[in-house]
Design a protein with these regions (language model features):
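Positively charged n-region of N-terminal signal peptides that target proteins for export
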Residues: 1-6
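Bacterial N-terminal signal peptides
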Residues: 7-16
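Pepsin/retropepsin-fold aspartyl endopeptidases
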Residues: 21-354
């Protein structure tokens, strides 16, 4: 009965977040600061964005998680949430569902899939608060997420991790989900917005300057680039179209894009992904993995969008990946350009140059 009632509440919460917004005077989007991080060491130029989780339930967390437009649902490392003695590589040491500081930790196991890695953990429920302490954003109800106890390389079975690995993922794709019956969905599906705004969000340019830093040292710069709530006057600056979920297995929407560099264009459904440090282009599974040389001029043509031209500045920045099913446009795009999702109209939009 408890699970049935929880499911009903979650369905109501998600549906309410996709209802039309109020027609009152238009409010302002909520700005969420993002942490810009370039990892130290080798390989160089691994660049990511993070959003800080302030609290889960009644528990203060203050844990940055990887911001990922290419997945849906939140995961967080066990030791960031629960007592260390509860966490191990073999599982979370509980024998029954437990309420801990407003977090319902269940015994239900789940696996979340990311590229070549899988995250194992338990389903939990809590109200999530994230962003800036000065202007925090909270989900309107407790939401499901994964407390992970290990991350595994899918091809080798090796448990991976360490100080410089993300302590979890903040997946904000508006489609799909993870865990049983895709129940673990984007926290953005449970966030309300100001009057007159469409539910959704947009990412403004994060800038081209990067700093080698770590979340552990707390020395990374921040940029207010995530905006929750879509105003009409902002949306009109984007070229928008209905989003596509090309394959039911994809936990992300795609656009039909072609990438070329003085050769035949490579056209595939394309993910615009903050969670990927490089740009990845499809090639035949029998070919080797390669990358473009520094100084290569690249053209990205997308149906219904302006052409995006750029020149590679390091290697690997554009990788040619055998067996990949879709193209991935990674963090380079977000330095000077914008991405928008309107949940109410189910539209995706790009804006070049600002």
């Amino acid at each position: 009965m408890k699970n049935f009632l929880t499911t009903l509440l979650l369905i109501f919460a998600v549906q309410s977040c996709f209802l039309p917004a109020s027609v009152d005077a238009e409010g302002l989007p909520t700005k969420v600061p993002l942490i810009k991080l370039e990892y130290p060491g080798k390989p160089k130029n691994i660049r990511m964005l993070y959003v800080k989780i302030l609290s889960l339930g009644n528990r203060t967390v203050n844990q940055p998680l990887l911001l990922d437009t290419g997945s849906s649902g939140m995961t967080i490392d066990c030791k960031s949430v629960l007592p260390a003695e509860t966490c191990s590589d073999t599982g979370i040491k509980i024998t029954q569902d437990q309420q801990i500081d407003g977090i319902m930790v269940t015994t239900e196991a789940a696996v979340m899939n990311y590229g070549t890695y899988d995250e194992y953990g338990n389903v939990a429920y809590a109200r999530v608060t994230f962003g800036s302490p000065d202007s925090p954003v909270s989900t309107i109800t407790s939401i499901p997420f994964l407390i992970r106890y290990k991350t595994v390389n899918r091809s080798t079975g090796e448990i991976v991790g360490g100080p410089l690995w993300p302590k979890g993922n903040f997946g904000i794709s508006p489609v799909g989900g993870g865990g049983p019956d895709q129940m673990i969905k984007s926290p953005m599906a449970y966030v309300s917005v100001g009057p007159g705004l469409h539910r959704g969000y947009y990412l403004s340019p994060i800038g081209t300057k990067w700093t080698v830093c770590t979340n552990e040292d707390g020395n990374c710069p921040q940029v207010e680039a995530l905006h929750i709530g879509v105003p009409k006057d902002v949306k009109k600056d984007f070229r928008v179209q209905r989003w596509k979920q090309t394959n039911w297995r994809y936990n992300f929407p795609t656009l039909d894009s072609c990438l070329s560099w003085g050769s035949e264009p490579i056209c595939r459904p394309t993910l615009y992904d903050t969670g990927n440090s490089t740009i990845m282009v499809v090639t035949d599974a029998s070919k080797p993995r390669t990358s473009l040389k520094t100084g290569t001029k690249v053209l990205v043509k997308t149906d219904g969008q302006e052409d995006w031209n750029f020149t590679t500045t390091y290697n690997p920045e554009v990788e040619i990946v055998p067996g990949l099913e879709h193209n991935i446009v990674g963090i380079r795009y977000f330095e000077k350009n914008s991405l928008l999702f309107d949940f109410e109209t189910r539209e995706i939009g790009l804006r070049l140059g600002h």
